[in-house]
């Protein structure tokens, strides 16, 4: 009989209870006992959902107060030494300082979790890292679950993935040299789990699904030779891609089972069936853990029947990966179109799908009603007239190569733009959004509830726009933005105005820490029926003589940060989005807007995990961006923004996007991203972020000037812009104004310094 489990469950709560408890704690409105109490209630609720669904295991260890990698660093005792915290007595206040920074130290670096929109905190390791152990919150959670008489399966990120995703700031240091000490700590953790009565532990090694060097693979084997004999059974979990080439290696190790992502990489199954020894468990990840579409259970049952015949009780059924990446439940969706809702499955519904698959193998007749309901919903989706739009299909078919090219090369455009825009050396700007105050959020909520008339809402938003414009003028910024007061989310705002999109009331997903996003659903062909931002941007420009940027979200980010239809290639959906955004760019230019920013912070996260698959993605992704941007005259300056992106290895494709100006996140990584731009001789203009907006810490003007001077060593000052790392939506006005004042001060000081140097050279 097949067994059932999940790799992980969303931690935020169906009503974002964790987010609100975190933020209350940060504001000092509640203490650690309240936060711990909310966390305990959420864990118990989520375990009960798994138990009620009939799963054979409940997963423990997927909860984190901020991030699972930070939790693991705390458990291992591998905290950044610069904070001076004692790992074994780490408080929640100190834990959050690691994530958010404090007056003395900037936050730990944050970056994307593989190719998802979740962010993790990058471990900081070095020769001094000892892995002597730290706070054992995991064991407290296991005790909670055992006290509820639940069948516990703990989950930990595995040692190879932990090291692979870490960084060292010590030149020449090999992180892999830490593995022997790290394995000793893991072995002790597994032994403690054994003593707690745990039978199975899930060790997540998604790093096996990327292009690991040979020495890392050898290190993996050495590590699991030890960990596989710890006395607790190890389920080695891979996900997000195929790990087929490692099947013989894993089969030779003393691991008790392997979990495979058979949604993203169904082709790997044959290799694993051939390699796995007779005792090994195969956990089949057959329910999509990263998208929200209802699974074709009938088709999956057919594929599982042969696996059951081969593996029997050694077959486990699961989602492809942790359900962290999907919303908690459809129960709260009262306004969603009934047909569309019937096509969906969120985390709680996916628990039922897993259980139904196991039931269908065990008792086909008992599962028949559920399977029949699924078949009806999927057939209705296939036949729906809401999915295919003939107008969009015709336009996509008419796209030409010329639509992806600007009128002139960058050098000529740049000359014309300098003449037209008249900007100083090192022009200052921001990335787009300004603080979303309580007044803004309350007005938007009242408007959505029907308690505020459209005209009154428009006037309130215009008041906020004027406030933002006046503050920017007072600060002395060169290129202004309208502040995006009217926007709840950079994707949702546009999706609400496009055909082919749908929106949930409560479909929240954790992005990082307390930051939750509510991805829209692309269910059909995408089309822009009317302008989306033109009137707002035109109004903002009317308030000032300075240049006002139009602010749009690019096609790749619209795609990456949505739940995307799975019935056509993602490249086709990206092209539809590009055409919609192209129309908006052209209309902004007609309205007199001379600088238009098309944000693509998610560009790199769309990369396949395997380098061999990159070229195809980069071709259609860069083409989509160019199509969105190329409909304007040479004098119109196109900006793009990328944050949390490590893209030195795809710089040719970044250059191929042909944006006139790119702004990037660099402050947390001390401008190291710029080294690649310099070595590549990136031809266009660039704005390296000079301060980290994700921390409340206000950096001084001197610190920002030093970063700019470092940037000038790599990129000529004539091609540099000065800006924060990212938008300022989540910050408060006092810290925002203080930081921007220092940023402008730094830019002016460096301008003066460079001018003086130039004068000295002329007189020498």
UniProtKB/Swiss-Prot annotation:
Residues noted as binding L-homocysteine in the record, renumbered to the chain:
431-433, 484, 599
Q: Where does L-methionine bind?
A: 431-433, 484, 599
Q: Where's the active site on this chain?
A: 694
Query: Which residues participate in 5-methyltetrahydropteroyltri-L-glutamate binding?
Result: 16-19, 112, 515-516, 561, 605
Superkingdom, natural source: Bacteria
> Which SUPFAM superfamilies does this one have?
UROD/MetE-like
Cofactor binding, note field: Binds 1 zinc ion per subunit.
The residues that hold Zn(2+) are 641, 643, 665, 726
Q: Which InterPro entries match?
A: Cbl-indep_Met_Synth_N (IPR013215), Cobalamin-indep_Met_synthase (IPR006276), Met_Synth_C/arc (IPR002629), UROD/MetE-like_sf (IPR038071)
Reactions that this protein is recorded to catalyse: 5-methyltetrahydropteroyltri-L-glutamate + L-homocysteine = tetrahydropteroyltri-L-glutamate + L-methionine
Annotated GO MF terms: 5-methyltetrahydropteroyltriglutamate-homocysteine S-methyltransferase activity; zinc ion binding
> Which keywords, in A-to-Z order, does the entry hold?
Amino-acid biosynthesis, Metal-binding, Methionine biosynthesis, Methyltransferase, Repeat, Transferase, Zinc
Query: Record's Gene3D superfamilies?
Result: 3.20.20.210
The record's family statement is:
Belongs to the vitamin-B12 independent methionine synthase family.
Which NCBIfam families does this UniProt record tie to the protein?
met_syn_B12ind, PRK05222.1
PANTHER family in the cross-refs: 5-METHYLTETRAHYDROPTEROYLTRIGLUTAMATE--HOMOCYSTEINE METHYLTRANSFERASE
State its role.
Answer: Catalyzes the transfer of a methyl group from 5-methyltetrahydrofolate to homocysteine resulting in methionine formation.
Q: Which HAMAP family match?
A: Meth_synth
Q: What is this protein called?
A: 5-methyltetrahydropteroyltriglutamate--homocysteine methyltransferase
Origin organism is Paraburkholderia xenovorans (strain LB400)
What phylogenetic lineage does the species belong to? Answer: Bacteria, Pseudomonadati, Pseudomonadota, Betaproteobacteria, Burkholderiales
């Amino acid at each position: 009989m097949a067994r059932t489990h999940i790799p992980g469950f969303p931690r935020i709560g169906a009503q974002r209870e964790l987010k609100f408890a975190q933020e209350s704690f940060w504001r000092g409105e509640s203490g650690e006992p309240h936060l711990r109490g909310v966390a305990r209630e959420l864990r118990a609720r989520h375990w009960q959902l798994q138990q009620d669904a009939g799963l054979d295991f409940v997963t423990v260890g997927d909860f984190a107060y901020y991030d699972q990698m930070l939790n693991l660093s705390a458990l291992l005792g591998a905290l950044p030494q610069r904070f001076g915290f004692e790992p074994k007595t780490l408080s929640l206040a100190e834990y959050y300082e690691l994530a958010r920074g404090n007056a003395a130290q900037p936050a730990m670096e944050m970056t994307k979790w593989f190719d998802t929109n979740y962010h993790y905190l990058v471990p900081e390791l070095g020769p001094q890292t000892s892995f002597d152990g730290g706070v054992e919150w995991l064991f407290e959670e296991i005790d909670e679950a055992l006290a509820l008489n639940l069948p516990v399966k703990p989950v930990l990120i595995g040692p190879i993935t932990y090291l692979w995703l870490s960084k060292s700031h010590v030149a020449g240091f090999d992180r892999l040299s830490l593995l022997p000490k790290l394995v000793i700590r893991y072995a002790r953790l597994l032994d403690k789990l054994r003593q707690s009565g745990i039978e199975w532990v899930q060790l997540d090694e998604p790093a096996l699904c990327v292009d690991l060097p040979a020495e890392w693979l050898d290190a993996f084997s050495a590590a699991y030779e030890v960990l596989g004999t710890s006395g607790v059974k190890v389920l080695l979990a891979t996900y997000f891609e195929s790990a087929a080439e490692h099947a013989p290696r894993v089969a030779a190790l003393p691991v008790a089972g392997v979990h495979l992502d058979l949604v993203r990489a169904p082709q790997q199954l044959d290799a694993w069936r051939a390699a796995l020894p007779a005792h090994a468990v195969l956990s089949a990840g057959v329910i999509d853990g990263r998208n929200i579409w209802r699974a074709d259970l009938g088709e999956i049952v057919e594929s599982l029947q042969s696996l059951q015949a081969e593996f029997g009780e050694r077959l486990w059924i699961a989602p492809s990966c942790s359900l962290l990446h999907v919303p908690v439940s459809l129960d709260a969706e009262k306004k969603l179109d009934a047909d569309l809702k019937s096509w969906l499955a969120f985390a709680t519904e996916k628990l039922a799908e897993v259980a139904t698959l196991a039931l269908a193998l065990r008792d086909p007749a008992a599962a028949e009603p559920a399977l029949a309901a699924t078949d009806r919903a999927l057939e209705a989706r296939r036949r729906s007239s809401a999915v295919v739009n003939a107008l969009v299909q015709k336009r996509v078919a008419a796209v030409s190569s010329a639509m992806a090219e600007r009128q002139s090369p960058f050098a000529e455009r740049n000359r014309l733009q300098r003449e037209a825009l008249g900007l100083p050396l090192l022009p200052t700007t921001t990335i787009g959004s300004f603080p979303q105050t309580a007044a803004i959020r309350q007005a938007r909520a009242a408007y959505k509830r029907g308690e505020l008339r459209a005209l009154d809402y428009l006037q309130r938003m215009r008041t906020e726009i004027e406030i933002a414009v006046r503050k920017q003028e007072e600060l002395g910024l060169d290129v202004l933005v309208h502040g995006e007061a009217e926007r709840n989310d950079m994707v949702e705002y546009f999706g609400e105005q496009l055909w082919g999109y749908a929106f949930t009331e409560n479909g929240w997903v954790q992005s990082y820490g307390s930051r939750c996003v509510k991805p829209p659903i692309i269910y059909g062909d995408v089309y822009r029926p009317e302008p989306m931002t033109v009137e707002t941007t035109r109004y903002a420009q009317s308030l000032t003589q300075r240049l006002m940027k139009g602010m749009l979200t690019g096609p790749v980010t619209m795609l990456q940060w949505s739940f995307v239809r799975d019935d056509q290639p993602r490249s086709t959906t990206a092209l539809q989005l590009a055409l919609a955004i192209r129309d908006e760019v052209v209309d902004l230019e007609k309205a007199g807007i001379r600088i238009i920013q098309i944000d693509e912070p998610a560009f790199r996260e769309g990369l396949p995990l395997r380098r061999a698959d990159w070229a195809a993605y980069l071709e259609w992704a860069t083409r989509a961006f160019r199509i969105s941007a190329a409909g304007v005259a040479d004098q119109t300056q196109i900006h793009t923004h990328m944050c949390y992106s490590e893209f030195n290895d795809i710089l040719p494709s970044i250059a191929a996007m042909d944006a006139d100006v790119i702004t990037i996140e660099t402050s947390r990584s001390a401008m190291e991203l710029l080294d690649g731009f310099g070595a590549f001789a990136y031809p266009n203009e660039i704005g390296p972020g000079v301060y980290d907006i994700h921390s409340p810490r206000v950096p001084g003007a001197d610190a920002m000037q030093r970063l700019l001077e470092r940037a000038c060593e790599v990129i000529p000052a004539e091609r540099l812009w000065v800006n924060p790392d990212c938008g300022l939506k989540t910050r408060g006005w006092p810290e925002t104004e203080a930081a921007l004042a220092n940023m402008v001060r730094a830019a002016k000081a460096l301008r003066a310094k460079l001018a003086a140097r130039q004068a000295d050279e002329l007189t020498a």
